């Protein structure tokens, strides 16, 4: 077939025009081939769009018919450009379902992307921003890097939005100028970071970002993305590391646990490791995740100290005891409450009002 039609796009192969010329000349393909001094098979393949119009063949046809050779060569170029246009349109159609799964308003609201009038515009904007040729690639769990999620059953929608959020975090992280990664400096900074749990976001965020910058960590804090499920990610780039978290659960204790969890992953130095969920993890990844969890728990509330609190609460947990312990540990009471709730010592409904919440506004 020497012409391809898709929607309102038509791609005419040069063979289409050669076939029309032969009809006008009342000439067979065999006779045309003889006059060009090429095989009849070559003309047959050309007319049937099985081969492109070569420069040599265009030159022969130009001499025989008195047609400008550039005109003939442009027929092939135009055909190829139309094919690209058709393939691009097909890809856009295939991506319509993907873009429906993504909250595009997230990017508009956070002034990351411009308002898009159509699904096609959304696709083009997202592809350029996410550095992918096709949004269907977002279905791949291993497209970027492994990520940590609290979603129990991971769906395709979760994978798509996790990849979207991850690339967004990476984009912001790569824009940050930080010093070369210094593991010792980061280890020394951990106690200072822990003290920030007693501060308000407007006070600790600039300090936290600057401290990370000195250690070679590009710290990214983003609002959570609908259907994402990702809590945080660590990704290495040469001599710096991107560490990103979001406000998916909004509670301050979850925020700080995520910070130290991701710092734990930084110290593991597994430069391509990402965790999706327990059901699909290898044992190695489970070990890495458990190790990062342990690290975060012990930094925030060392186990031995935590056990003294539990012993003192044998007759019941009171808010006064929580505040006493938090003051002793130099940490926000909400972090103690969150740990007690997580461990099942107290129900999630108890003292929840005492757990501070953060909201990320870009």
Model-assigned labels for residue ranges:
Residues 1-362:
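Active-site hotspot residues in diverse enzymes, especially metal/ion-binding acidic/histidine motifs
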